[in-house]
Amino acid sequence: MIAVNNVSLRFADRKLFEDVNIKFTPGNCYGLIGANGAGKSTFLKVLSGEIEPQTGDVHMSPGERLAVLKQNHFEYEEYEVLKVVIMGHKRLYEVMQEKDAIYMKPDFSDEDGIRAAELEGEFAELNGWEAESEAAILLKGLGISEDLHTKKMADLGGSEKVKVLLAQALFGKPDVLLLDEPTNHLDLQAIQWLEEFLINFENTVIVVSHDRHFLNKVCTHIADLDFNKIQIYVGNYDFWYESSQLALKLSQEANKKKEEQIKQLQEFVARFSANASKSKQATSRKKLLEKITLDDIKPSSRRYPYVNFTPEREIGNDVLRVEGLTKTIDGVKVLDNVSFIMNREDKIAFTGRNELAVTTLFKIISGEMEADSGTFKWGVTTSQAYFPKDNSEYFEGSDLNLVDWLRQYSPHDQSESFLRGFLGRMLFSGEEVHKKANVLSGGEKVRCMLSKAMLSGANILILDEPTNHLDLESITALNNGLISFKGAMLFTSHDHQFVQTIANRIIEITPNGIVDKQMSYDEFLENADVQKKLTELYAE
């Protein structure tokens, strides 16, 4: 267990937390959420002792061990992969080092023998004999092949280093586990493995993540950082979001009898619980949900941008025909004879292990890049809005304020008040609209690019990782806006829930062909024939 008592912290004149009092108990996984900049990562550093609060303290039960997912990917460059994982249990690694140093001595004294015996006893108590096999199991689960286990960290790629550091945090069954964005840079298989690991983990987990599917899968509770306080709610992220919306609705219907409000809450909980999986964690979470009262749900103060793409005209039957597109970049063939026909109601999610392949395809069909061979043709009734993964060219060197920046992309001569109102709905309020475009944060740039796409009135959206840099509120708003979109879409995203709730067709691009299926993302992942075909294509 980890208890937070009267913790307050401020940086300069900015207050992050004030008199926070909460407990995180064993057997539960807490999703720590809050707007960008609210202080989620800072709070994890307070819990780990890396940052000292101005008032209050953090208390752990005596003898308990805390593990943290390290963020510095270059910290262990000269160490072997397997050893880096075992370093996750600091005391065990110290014992191993001291023990090995004694046995390496050429003149082994009686004192050395006594000390070695003490260390051997402690080594056995700490499950030292299983350390290497446990580390290897964690690495294998995350997709690090055995031939890399004895390599130095410096020899690994960026995403491989992330996996090793994650294995380090998970190693040795820590009593409290702190994970800051653990799914970043992980492939789908590694995320699924991590989900199962955390679902079966018996101690305390506190996780920060922008991945709603992940939060829904692993969390028993949500810790909401808002107004410098942290409030803990039972349930996963979707339950927190839906219940906060219900609480807002009930607060606006204050004249309704309490009995009616209680009935609405009970119906909501029953409906939500009915969709839960049968896992041990989901079952225990369901029992907690059934005890919820009206006082346990509260409206959120979160602000959600207003995302609404309205096509100016309907699409005809001819949408897009792609035939034999091939492209080589820096000597590597990223697209090889890609062909497909897009229909008017398609919302196609593009997947694949090589992200550059999807980005290249989107650039070609948007007219930003030439193919080496092959053709594509848009239907005469179509108009496209392209959202690139790298948007830097739209902002770098721009001295325009946000109103003038947006005006240059407006197809109609819109008034200042219209553009200010539009930006306001995307959470740029008051004086923020006078910000220079070249000083925006990553999330602000994405909201500007989405505003540009909405103003276009396009009936085809081409979106390359539109959820990057967005907070959970903006991702949720964009997700809902695209579900309602009446046009057609080609898009890619690492956000599982985003893809699952929007796409009705999946195209995976492999080096040896595509797999194109009219089905949802989860069906695509669970379809044995599809997965067999993909395995064959990647193996060729």
From Swiss-Prot:
The keyword ATP-binding applies. Residues 2-252, 320-537 form the ABC transporter domain. Signal peptide: none annotated. GO terms for molecular function: ATP binding; ATP hydrolysis activity. SMART domains: AAA. Keywords: ATP-binding, Nucleotide-binding, Repeat, Transport. ATP binds at G34, A35, N36, G37, A38, G39, K40, S41. InterPro entries: AAA+_ATPase, ABC_tran_Xtn, ABC_transporter-like_ATP-bd, ABCF_ATPase, P-loop_NTPase. It holds the Pfam family ABC_tran. Belongs to the ABC transporter superfamily. This is Uncharacterized ABC transporter ATP-binding protein YkpA. It comes from Bacillus subtilis (strain 168).
